[in-house]
UniProtKB/Swiss-Prot annotation:
Residues 80-114 are annotated as: Disordered. This is DNA-directed RNA polymerase subunit omega. It comes from Sphingopyxis alaskensis (strain DSM 13593 / LMG 18877 / RB2256) (Sphingomonas alaskensis). Keywords: DNA-directed RNA polymerase, Nucleotidyltransferase, Transcription, Transferase. The keyword rRNA-binding does not apply. It catalyses: RNA(n) + a ribonucleoside 5'-triphosphate = RNA(n+1) + diphosphate. SUPFAM superfamilies: RPB6/omega subunit-like.
Length: 114
């Protein structure tokens, strides 16, 4: 197989920095066991990822969405209504904390300032 260069892929992903991010993400997917869309030909995962992009066997838009999804730490929930189970859980936690708190001293007795 001929060497894969950035010039082979730059017409599919015009920004070289995006190309690096997408191909690195795809190489990590391949390392994780994702199915190959081209023959390996004894190439390492980054080269296979670049070949997949160059031969258009995988869409850069799909890679971009997968990359963004893998980097998100919080999943945004479109549902604005509070979840009944989480509301009950918060109430139960508040009751547990209240029950575990030390008892208060009576209002006028036993204070440090008399």
């Amino acid at each position: 197989m001929a060497r894969v260069t950035v010039e082979d892929c730059v017409d599919k992903v015009p920004n070289r920095f995006d190309l690096v991010l997408l191909s690195a993400h795809r190489a990590r997917e391949i390392s994780g066991g994702s199915e190959l869309t081209v023959d390996r030909d004894r190439d390492k995962n980054p080269v296979v990822a670049l070949r997949e992009i160059a031969e258009q066997t995988i869409r850069p838009k799909d890679l971009h969405e997968a990359l963004v999804g893998s980097l998100q730490k919080v999943v945004i929930d479109d549902d604005d209504t509070p979840d009944e189970i989480s509301s009950i859980s918060r109430s139960a936690e508040a009751l547990r904390l209240t029950a575990a708190a030390p008892p208060r001293s009576p209002a006028g007795g036993g204070g440090d300032f008399e």
